[in-house]
Amino acid sequence: MSIEVGQKAPIFTLPTDEGEMLSLDDLKGKKVILYFYPKDDTPGCTKEACGFRDVWSQLSKAGVVVLGISKDSVKAHQSFKQKYNLPFTLLSDKDNTVCEQYGVMVDKNRFGKKYKGIERTTFLIDEEGVISAVWPKVKVDGHVAEVVGRL
């Protein structure tokens, strides 16, 4: 299932990097940048997270919420967040339920080994909970600027 512009964003509840539960439904009335990434503390994922960190003051002043989602554990998210001073929330989707809902789980092949993994994807969700932009197969360079430009 892939999510397209104009669709209602699938509602989910996941544990945050602080171990609390967060529901997308709780963020109605705010713009949300929801970005899915493969793994904490890897080169591309770190660069993407630090990109959002570096424009955080601009985003927070505009009332925009940034949420990062991966399969990493709450503990891994805590370490990643602390190591890179990330000011936004990271969510743990250990069983890939939300990744599947949003259609970001894809077949991958690394060194001949086939597996299911997260395809780096960003969704912009408007104040009504509707998808207003989608960036599939994200290339990290220039991505954050492109997202900010759509706000």
Swiss-Prot record:
The active site is at 45 (cysteine sulfenic acid (-soh) intermediate). It catalyses: a hydroperoxide + [thioredoxin]-dithiol = an alcohol + [thioredoxin]-disulfide + H2O. GO terms for biological process: cell redox homeostasis; cellular response to oxidative stress. Its EC number is 1.11.1.24. It comes from the Bacteria. InterPro entries: AhpC/TSA (IPR000866), Peroxiredoxin_AhpC-typ (IPR024706), Peroxiredoxin_BCP/PrxQ (IPR050924), Thioredoxin-like_sf (IPR036249), Thioredoxin_domain (IPR013766). SUPFAM superfamilies: Thioredoxin-like. The keyword Repeat does not apply. One of its GO terms (cellular component) is cytoplasm. Keywords: Antioxidant, Disulfide bond, Oxidoreductase, Peroxidase, Redox-active center. It is an enzyme of class 1 (oxidoreductase). The keyword Disulfide bond applies. Monomer. Thiol-specific peroxidase that catalyzes the reduction of hydrogen peroxide and organic hydroperoxides to water and alcohols, respectively. Plays a role in cell protection against oxidative stress by detoxifying peroxides and as sensor of hydrogen peroxide-mediated signaling events. This is Putative peroxiredoxin bcp. It comes from Coxiella burnetii (strain RSA 493 / Nine Mile phase I). The gene is bcp.
